[in-house]
Every structure is written in structure tokens, then in C-alpha cells.
Amino acid sequence: MDSNTVSSFQDILMRMSKMQFGSSSEDLNGMITQFESLKFYRDSLGEAVMRMGDLHSLQIRNGKWREQLSQKFEEIRWLIEEVRHRLKITENSFEQITFMQALQLLLEVEQEIRTFSFQLI
């Protein structure tokens, strides 16, 4: 993963952790957890692509990697919808900027994971 993406993830996670949404703070914590999970998944998929010969061991280790990939895309779609919803309802400019950047990052990561997965197929 390039350093800009790493710092973007870290920056967004830090800013999201500072937000308070009252009764929906559990939802925000869930989003943060999914962001972190997505970052780790993207990193591991990228490393597998960089080793290219790792496809065979990836398939042996986890015969359900396509199912996991599908699940990650569902998580990304859910996060995108959740971020869009938060963006629509918030009036705080700090939160708007954070969610706009989170949305952009999610779209970039979705594309990167698609690229990695096509290289692994």
C-alpha cells in the first residue's frame, strides 16, 4: 500500500474516533472497526499480489477466498452507503470533510481490491 493511502486511513480513523454522534456512537465505532478490517484485508491482498506466486498458497490456506472477497465488497458497499448517509445528515463542516475523504478513500480502495483480485484470478 502506498504511503498516501496509509496516512489517509490513519487520518480518517483518527478523525472519526473523535466524533460524537450521541446515540449512534455504536454505529460509528462499527464503521471504524470495518475501516480497520478493510485496511488490513487490502494490505494482505496487495502483499499476495506482490508475491504473485502466493496465489496457490492463498487458495490452499483458504479455499473460500472468493467468498471472503465478495463479503469485503459487501462491506465496502455498506460503508459507502453509511458514509453517504452521514454526509447528508451532518451540518458540521469537520464531519463533512472527514466523511467526504472517507468516501473518496473507500472508492479508491474498492478499485484497488478489484485490481488485486483480478490479478489473483
Curated annotation (Swiss-Prot):
Compartmental location: Virion; Host nucleus
GO cellular component: host cell nucleus; virion component
Name of one Pfam family that matches: Flu_NS2
Gene Ontology terms describing biological process: exit of virus from host cell nucleus through nuclear pore
Keyword Transport included in the entry's annotation: yes
Motif extent (Nuclear export signal): 12-21, 85-94
Domain of life of the source: Viruses
Keyword terms, alphabetized: Host nucleus, Host-virus interaction, Transport, Virion
Record bears the keyword Transport: yes
InterPro entries: Flu_NS2
Misc note: Average number present in a viral particle is estimated to be 130-200 molecules.
The family this protein is said to belong to: Belongs to the influenza viruses NEP family.
HAMAP family linked: INFV_NEP
Function: Mediates the nuclear export of encapsidated genomic RNAs (ribonucleoproteins, RNPs). Acts as an adapter between viral RNPs complexes and the nuclear export machinery of the cell. Possesses no intrinsic RNA-binding activity, but includes a C-terminal M1-binding domain. This domain is believed to allow recognition of RNPs bound to the protein M1.
Subunit structure: Interacts with protein M1. May interact with host nucleoporin RAB/HRB and exportin XPO1/CRM1.
Protein name in UniProt: Nuclear export protein
Source species: Influenza A virus (strain A/Duck/Hong Kong/2986.1/2000 H5N1 genotype C)
Gene name, Swiss-Prot/TrEMBL: NS
